[in-house]
Regions:
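Phox homology (PX) phosphoinositide-binding domain
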Residues: 1-226
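C-terminal, extended alpha-helical scaffolding domains
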Residues: 179-411
């Protein structure tokens, strides 16, 4: 029953991957192009085949592929975050961990309840769960590809040595997941960072541009988070409506065939008036609406929720550098007043000044690019979603008109 979904591997070829789940308006450079050409699922692991084309002299070949796992993507992301040289850049958000537990649990429950349903019902539910699993799998691959493409499109991060090793080194990178101790350390670091962030947030920025961006991003992140939660509820409602319509359609179809009437051809029921299909056309339309909203809206919101957090992290690093610079100025004044350790204080003050200026210089352009990127992505996806919604609305209208015609005896 679970063949190809749990016990066996799942192979995702180029033609099966479909469009990228999230449009992040990547302005790719032909000198370095990265994509995930294939992916293989083996129980709890997903192996991604990362394909690279490049004319850069840093690489030994112009075209090559390597196999990478999720932990290696996280390692690459963390190496960017921990590198002080990249403190002034928005680090592309790490792709979410592959999670197929819910789909596999549903398949297991389906197998346990096989004896209580007809063969037709079992086959139909199995196909639906397989489709759900494949959709999650495609989305997982797409999010990992988006991360790599964002790095490859960045004028600075694309030159990183770790990124080149990730793309070119043919062997396993020997990267493991974090153990409990490391996860606990990360937790405490985040607690300290959150507390420090509250203190830093109260500092008035010396630059109006960054003060405005800080205020805007706090509000923007909150709004996107709220919109993401509401879009998930909306999509869930469409899916529930599709399931309910299909159940009603199946019941009415059975009733219509049992009492010798043509009831099965009324309402939002079969795909054609001659019967033979138990799945309602109205249900199919609702399911397509849910799928399109998930692809064009929910995924976009989830991505930019993570990207806006990365932008907030950039502003935090700059504010932290500003506070350090101001503290260094105070320490220098005290050293001069006491005429003690002046040279050391001057050196420290100069280091803090250089760090703050360097972060500020790159951060401004990063935030401008982020605005351009998100506006373009939202415009594109919302226009496409509106066009799809119109298409589905017309389909619903035609279906209702057809049903009315049948009920009135016009057809």
């Amino acid at each position: 029953m679970q063949e190809g979904l749990d016990d066996g591997p799942d192979f995702l070829s180029e033609e099966d991957r479909g469009p990228r789940a999230v449009n992040v308006d990547l302005q790719t450079d032909a000198t370095l192009q990265v994509d995930i050409s294939d992916a293989l699922s083996e129980r709890d692991k997903v192996k991604f085949t990362v394909h690279t084309k490049s004319s850069l002299p840093n690489f030994k070949q112009n075209e090559f592929s390597v196999v990478r796992q999720h932990e290696e993507f996280i390692w690459l992301h963390d190496s960017f975050v921990e590198n002080e040289e990249y403190a002034g850049y928005i680090i592309p958000p790490a792709p979410p961990r592959p999670d197929f537990d819910a789909s596999r649990e549903k398949l297991q429950k389906l197998g346990e309840g096989e004896g209580s349903m007809t063969k037709e019902e079992f086959t139909k539910m199995k196909q639906e769960l397989e489709a759900e699993y494949l959709a999650i799998f495609k989305k997982t691959v797409a999010m990992h590809e988006v991360f790599l493409c964002r790095v490859a499109a960045h004028p600075v991060l694309r030159k990183d040595l770790n990124f080149h090793v990730f793309l070119e080194y043919g062997q396993d990178l020997s990267v493991r997941g974090k153990n409990k101790k490391e996860k606990l350390e990360d937790f405490f670091k985040n607690v300290v960072k959150s507390a420090d962030g509250v203190l830093v947030a109260g500092v008035k920025d010396v630059d109006d541009f960054f003060e405005h961006e800080k205020t805007f991003l706090l509000e923007y992140h909150t709004r996107v988070k709220d919109a993401s939660a509401k879009s998930d509820r909306m999509i869930r409602s469409h899916k529930n409506a599709a399931d309910d319509i299909n159940r009603i359609a199946s019941t009415l179809y059975t009733l219509g065939t049992q009492d010798g009437t043509e009831l099965c051809k009324y309402g939002l029921i079969p795909g054609h008036t001659g019967g033979g299909q138990r799945e309602g056309r109205g249900g199919k339309i609702e399911a397509r609406v849910a799928a399109d909203e998930d692809l064009k809206l929910a995924d976009l919101l989830k991505y930019y929720l993570r990207e806006s957090q990365a932008a907030k992290d950039l502003l935090y690093r700059r504010s932290r550098a500003l506070v350090d610079y101001e503290n260094a100025n105070k320490a220098l004044d005290k050293a001069r007043a006491k005429n003690r350790d002046v040279l050391q204080a001057e050196t420290s003050q100069q280091i803090c000044c250089n760090k703050f200026d360097k972060i500020s210089e790159s951060a401004k352009q990063e935030l401008i690019d982020f605005k351009t990127r998100r506006v373009s992505a939202f415009r594109k996806n919302l226009v496409e979603l509106a066009e799809l919604e119109l298409k589905h609305a017309k389909g619903n209208l035609q279906l209702l008109q057809s049903c009315l015609g049948v009920l009135k005896g016009n057809t």
